[in-house]
Amino acid sequence: LSGIDTGFYRYYDPLNHEIDHAGLMTDLTHMPNDSMVLFQMVGHNPTATDPSVEQWKEMSSILRKKNVLVFFDMAYQGFASGCLETDAFAVRHFIEEGHKVVFAQSYSKNMGMYSVRVGGVTFMNEVREEKEAILKTLKHLNMCSFGAPPIHGSQVVEEVYSSPALLASW
């Protein structure tokens, strides 16, 4: 990323096949204030290992003190626990705790629409000027990327989510 300082945080302990809890919390604690962190959640790619509810809460507490923008990438909602609600815990918790959150969600995999690339991005932020700047940037990126994406994939997702019978069947 041009002009952006990037870093890494420890996440997975390959010897024990689990979250590197101590390393992860240490690295998050030492992040610069007012920075951004990206989490791939539920069915974490490529490890398929996710933090526990308690670990997410601890991560939230650390990052809230540092005013970090938290970016969640969720492509596999429903795959980790089998429940859409359970798999959305981290995003909802961070929002409830007052974080600035960016949430990218894909339906391409969990709805079996691989070639359609259906998804969306949500921003949770209380600062009006920041919201307006983000929206302006997103509109620009959208026009530069694809302008007018096909609508049928989003219509399928809307139909499934709007129908209790289809949602239960899915």
Report residues per predicted region.
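Alpha-helical subdomain
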Residues: W56, G78-D87, H140-G147
